[in-house]
C-alpha cells in the first residue's frame, strides 16, 4: 500500500465534519482506499456476549459505542458532498472504505465467558482481575506495563524488572492501583499472558452516563 494522506480533515466552511484516518492506494489493484483505524482495549463484565458490557479501562468508552460510531459516522465520511469536492481538488477517487478495529479483549479471570457478538474468533485475548482476587494470580513473574507497551507482545524481558506474584500482591495490598494496571506474565524473558488488575470499585462500574 502507498500512503496518500493521513489525518485529512473534511470541512464544510469553517466547520470540521470529520477526519479521514488514512487514504491509501493499493499497489496491486490501483484502488484508492479510505481506512478508518482504531486500536482499543476493553474489559468484559456481566453478560460478555453483549458489546455494551465491554468497557475501556478508564470506563469512558464501550465497545458498542465505538463500533456504532465507526459504522454510522466514520465509515460514511467519503459519501459526503464535501468529500466529493475535496477528492476532486486532490485528484483522487475513493473506491472503498475499510473499518479496521484492532486491540485486545480482556475476559474475567477464571470465569468461562462468551466473546461479544461479531468479534473475530481469533482476536487477541487477556484477563482482568479485581484487587481482592489477586491471590488467584498464577505464581510467576509479572511486569506492570506502561501505556506505550500495551500494543505489542514483549520479548527479551530482563527478569530483574519483574515482580513475582507475592511482590505484586504486596505492592497493592493496602491502597490498590489508582487506575487499572496492565500486566504481562513473563516466562524465560517472553510474554505468555496479559491482563489488567483493577481496584475493587471498578468491578461494579456505573455505565449509565456512557451513551
Where are these regions (language model features)?
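Intrinsically disordered, low-complexity Ser/Thr/Pro/Gly-rich regulatory segments
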Residues: 1-211
Amino acid at each position: 500500500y502507498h500512503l496518500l494522506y493521513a489525518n485529512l480533515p473534511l470541512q464544510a466552511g469553517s466547520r470540521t465534519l470529520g477526519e479521514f484516518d488514512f487514504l491509501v492506494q493499493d499497489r496491486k489493484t490501483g484502488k484508492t482506499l479510505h481506512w478508518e483505524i482504531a486500536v482499543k482495549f476493553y474489559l468484559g463484565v456481566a453478560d460478555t456476549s453483549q458489546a455494551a458490557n465491554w468497557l475501556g479501562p478508564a470506563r469512558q468508552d464501550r465497545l458498542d459505542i465505538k463500533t456504532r460510531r465507526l459504522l454510522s459516522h466514520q465509515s460514511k465520511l467519503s459519501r459526503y458532498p464535501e468529500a466529493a469536492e475535496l477528492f476532486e481538488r486532490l485528484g483522487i477517487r475513493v473506491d472503498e472504505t475499510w473499518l479496521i478495529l484492532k486491540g485486545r479483549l480482556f475476559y474475567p479471570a477464571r470465569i468461562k465467558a462468551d466473546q461479544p457478538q461479531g468479534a473475530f474468533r481469533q482476536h487477541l485475548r487477556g484477563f482482568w482481575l479485581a484487587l481482592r482476587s489477586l491471590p488467584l494470580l498464577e505464581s510467576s513473574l509479572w511486569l506492570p506495563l506502561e501505556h506505550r507497551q500495551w500494543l505489542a507482545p514483549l520479548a527479551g524481558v530482563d527478569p530483574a524488572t519483574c515482580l513475582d506474584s507475592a511482590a505484586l500482591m504486596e505492592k497493592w495490598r493496602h491502597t490498590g492501583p489508582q487506575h487499572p494496571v496492565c500486566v504481562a506474565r513473563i516466562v524465560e524473558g517472553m510474554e505468555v499472558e496479559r491482563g489488567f488488575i483493577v481496584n475493587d470499585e471498578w468491578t461494579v462500574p456505573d455505565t449509565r452516563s456512557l451513551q
